[in-house]
Amino acid sequence: LVLAVVAIGAAIVMGGGNPASLIDVPSILVVFGGTAGALIAAYPLGSILKIHTVVLKAVFGSAPDPAQTIKDLVKFAEIARREGILSLENHVEDMKDPFIVRGIKMAVDGTDPELIRTILDTELEALMDRHAGGKAILDAAGRMAPAFGMIGTLMGLIFMLQNMDDPSAIGPGMAVALITTMYGAIIANVITGPIAEKLGARDSEEVLVKTVIIAGVMSIQSGDNPRVVESKLLTYLPPAQRAAIEQAA
């Protein structure tokens, strides 16, 4: 995102252009205000107001590490095998992922395995729904912004054609008219589009890790040998990453 902005700015300067000439308040109102208004009409206001948390997590959040998660689960399986599953209650502080904590606590409490799976699956589905909702808003903004950019351009052309008696104003008028199209394209292709794609990728990563956790918790509760737990969980990883973990072990 930052690289794209820097590249565009550098291209403007290197081309001899003045970045300040690309700032037009009426165009900003048409594109940004129009897009915001359309989003408010299409989605609940609460969801829109929370979109910044989704954006920050997608851009600045650290990606979950499935390999480390597997190592942690295998370690907990070894403890449960050696000291009994109840001993895991003394190692809750070592569990970095709250999802693991919830699963292990239910296993320690003797909760029915099917109920544990149902609860964890429901939480995973809720996570996926939240991510899908955030991505849908960003995708919608990416579709709407170019449309409002075109609306602004058409408005500018109409105003320009109404003043055809002054030929000297045609060039500047056309330039201002096209600025709104540029704003819409930038919003769609530099801001909302890339962030939505990254959110989709981050969602896949989190779903993978939580799927691994569910499988690990169920395997630990059933009393599987730690080697069996590791073998089960490694099947979720790509072959190259799986081989690297096996060699390290």
Specify the residue positions occupied by each region the protein language model found.
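Helix-termination/interfacial motifs at the ends of transmembrane alpha-helices
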Residues: 2, 6-19, 125-202
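Large intracellular
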Residues: 10-135, 205-249
